[in-house]
Structure formats: C-alpha cells, structure tokens
C-alpha cells in the first residue's frame, strides 16, 4: 500500500490578502506584494505552528509530513537572500536564513518522534535561491539526522543550471551527487512519462515526484511499472476525463487555470 504524507505549507507573502483577510507576512517587508515583516515573536509562533500541524497530522493517522520549503513560500522566503533582509538571528548569513527551517525540523522530530516520517521540499534557482545554497541546505538537513527524505523541485529535472559556473552538468546531477547518507532523495520537474521516470531513477535518485501526469492518470505509477514506454494522454483533456480520474469539480476548475491543460468544452 501507499504511505500518507501531509504537506505543511505557509505561503507567506504569496498569500492572497483577500483570502486570508489581512496583510500577508514576509521575512522582510515587500512593497510589491504589500507584505509586512514578521516580528521576531511571530517567527517563533510560525515555527511552533508548523510543529503543531505535524503533531495534528500524526494524531490524525498520517505516516509523516513534508515541510514545504520550496517555490517561494514562507520557508523559501526565509532561505532567500532576496526576500530575507532581516538583521536578527533569522536573517543575514545563510546559517541564519536556514534557522527557521532547522528549528521547524528539530521541533517536529522532538514532538513526533523519529519513527514519524519527515521530509523537506526545497527548490533551487528561482525566488533568489542560489544552487550552492540549496545544496548546502540539503546537507544541513542530512547532517541533522532528523529527516527521512528530501524532495527537490527542479522545475525541469533535465536542464542545465541557470548559473553559468554550475553548467557542466544538469541540475539533476548536482543533487544526485550529494552524500545523503540514509536520507532518501526524490526530485520533481517535467518528469512526464515512463522513459523519463527510468532516466531519473537510473541517476541515483530513490524515487520520483509526479504532478501533471498523476493528475491525468490516477494510476500513473502502476502504468509505468507495467509498460516501460507508457506515455500519458495528450493535453488538453476534457473535464469529463479528469472527473473519471477522481478530480473534484473544484479541482477541475483550478486545473482550468493551467494553460492548455483542460479543454474549454466537452467533445461529443
């Protein structure tokens, strides 16, 4: 069977004010998003809220949690030199910018125990995250001995890094070469068919993270294991197809925001 892992997420400055009912919060004030900076006590409360959320997930019967530290959300914002301009213990040096994530991981491990699966999602390059700093954060997580897996969202698993000094090998290779000890590594980013799954797994990656293709086919993993040449259905697909794959009407409506994913009308 499968494991149930809850992803813990706070959008920070990416939170829509009309949805949350107040001004978004960010490591440092941000004029573009009209976000104000967390106070020091609010940062500690944020940390405690992540820990409490993990504990609630455990009590609800989940096998583990993943802390979302990627895609420009709040943990990523703290890691980013671009968005984190704080002058307290949570800003400045990379070690200080990593502090919130380290404290969240420490708190979850202490509250939920080492038998409760704990993963961290990270992403390089965008939102001010430099590749070398992303790798350093991975190594900090590994050396802590408190995480079971790292989930690296690469945007495109097969592309070369954006930073010229790292372009001798793909983004995938940079992360696959990390000495991760007993920590498992998964990657995401334009892994869409059986051939690409195999290529990633043969690159010293423990498992793959699938988004779009798993939305198109709820049984994508089984199809890939049964057919090494499996290709998902071409997009756009009808709302009816997505309903048959188990998507709710709200989910289907949301997927309509993805350009070229859902057709505007059912075919006869």
Named regions from a protein language model:
Residues 1-268:
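Flavin-dependent oxidoreductase catalytic cores
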